[in-house]
């Protein structure tokens, strides 16, 4: 992950059972791999492989959070010009879609982002219904990325 900060030194904390906890991706890899494969199948233009997610977490560049419904993988992105940190929710997967888990855990991740010195939360998605869900709850569209694939490239 470009411009990400190594975050393995995140302080341990006790959390209520209803909140996500930092998981051991090695121990949970079979479940996580299935979730990442489902994300990639639904979004074939994503460029990473399941093993890349595993490697980022093991290397300390991302954190794997497990929750009863599924999992989230986050990282910290640092702006190269301002040095501001953004708490980036890279992947989120649940066994049952449509449960609005992003809202259920929003306050938790806002708290964690604040604790690590981030100035914002960020998600990137190709799921159209997420726009309404997020913008109705205080999120805004920071940018729209258009891509043109070169035939020779």
How would you describe each model-predicted region?
Residues 42-63:
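Active-site rim helix/loop that mediates acceptor-substrate recognition in acyltransferases
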Residues 59-98:
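Conserved donor-binding loop and adjoining core beta-sheet/short helix segment
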Residues 66-70, 117, 140-142:
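Short glycine/proline-enriched coil/turn segments at helix->beta-strand junctions
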Residues 2-48:
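Short amphipathic alpha-helix that is part of the acyltransferase structural core
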Residues 10, 65, 87-89, 146-149:
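Generic recognition of long tandem-repeat/solenoid scaffolds
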Residues 84-137:
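Acyl-donor binding region in acyl/amide transferases
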Residues 2-4, 123-153:
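Active-site/acyl-donor-binding loops of N-acyltransferases
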């Amino acid at each position: 992950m470009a411009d990400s900060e190594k975050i393995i030194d995140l302080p341990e904390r006790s959390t209520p059972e209803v909140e996500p906890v930092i998981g051991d991706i090695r121990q949970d890899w079979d479940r996580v791999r299935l979730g990442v494969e489902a994300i990639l199948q639904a979004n074939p233009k994503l460029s990473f492989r399941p093993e890349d997610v595993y490697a980022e977490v093991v290397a300390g560049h991302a954190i794997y959070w497990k929750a009863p419904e599924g999992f989230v993988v986050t990282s910290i992105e640092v702006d190269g010009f301002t040095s501001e940190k953004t708490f980036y929710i890279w992947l989120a997967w649940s066994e049952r879609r449509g449960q609005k888990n992003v809202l259920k855990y929003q306050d938790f991740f806002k708290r964690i982002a604040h604790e690590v010195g981030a100035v914002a939360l960020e998600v990137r998605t190709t799921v159209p219904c997420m726009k309404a869900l997020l913008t109705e709850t205080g999120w805004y569209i920071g940018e729209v990325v258009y891509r043109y694939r070169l035939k020779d490239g």
